[in-house]
Amino acid sequence: MAFDECIENPAPYKYVKDSCDRTYRWLVRCKKEMERLNSLDDTINKNQMLFGINQGGTFDDIRIEHMQRIAELDLPGYAIGGLAVGESHEEMYHILMLYFLMHL
């Protein structure tokens, strides 16, 4: 998995948005570095996979935008981050359903 910023919950909208932007930049850097390392002859395991981590707190619009951005990187897998960190069960299940519906 790529680096991501684990923010507190709840967090202000702007901070969550900025954090997602930062996490996306880290993911792009991780992908480039992994591609560089896998191009080397002496790389031991070229089959490692890089997963992107979807963040966005409990803000639907940020989560959707962040997932769309990281999906464009065409990674082998994705994870849902920033859940079960203090939000209500209702909020957690809402985010899981949002994620699930985006991928039907």
Where on the chain are the PLM-derived regions?
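Non-catalytic, usually N-terminal nucleic-acid engagement modules in DNA/RNA processing proteins
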Residues: M1-T43
